[in-house]
């Protein structure tokens, strides 16, 4: 209900297994172990069994490495479990991020269309939930647009480095360089086993993206209230007990997904890990990262649906304005700000 199917698949246990095996294959290739590389096919392994066996070690790479060595004794040579899991996390994030970015692009395009279409549509601005002074709906949509564009840019720029430090971070950096290149990931300056900047950066970027979507959702929910009635979603949700209701369901989902991202972002941005390997904090990242990626995409997809089908009731906006009509100077300023937002959007596409 919350997350689009492609995103669910992108962060599934099967996706993590495939990513771990991609990391193992790249390690085998850069060390010249063809037998180990040939053993790195997901269909050869039972993901449910690996998850179950991984509980005993608090780590799914331990049983995976054991299974790999049954087929190729040289597999996993020189690496530690965290090398494989951190690299897999970056691969999972890379694939899922593309899906999140696509949904953000769709939401931004819809916001841009609304901003342009309603550049001069007057409405009441509200501060502390009270009417303040007139503005335009185009400017409100322009604010959504800039928030989405800037969040998208931040997420797209988040670093995704490979990890190959060996048991205590002393692996040959030349090998790490070739390993990263084989996977198309960034080469780290030093191993980041307990220096979690990349994970924190990704978590913060996903959180910001979710917040931009939640802002859209909250504004739509408030504007769609019966007593306000200034917008409505084309595909409104219903009620099990009150058939007359038209609930802004997509906006509600955008807010719900964003809250789940916020809850998981704290686990990704904590950062205070002990010595050369964290006991518990690192392990907590895995489900938190999957959830943050999935629900950030869910928030963006819901915001996109809400905006693409948003019905704007300009007559109700005009009727709700409790003060004199927007003076010419104010209208011109609002329109100019809309144009600035649209230019910012076009520069980003």
Model features per residue range: what roles?
Residues 84, 260, 321-323:
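Weak global preference for isoleucine
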Residues 41, 45, 76, 118, ...:
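Histidine (H) residue identity feature
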Residues 279-282:
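Polytopic membrane enzymes that build or remodel cell-surface glycoconjugates and lipids
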Residues 89-102, 109, 116, 123, ...:
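Charged, flexible cofactor/metal-binding loops and thiol motifs
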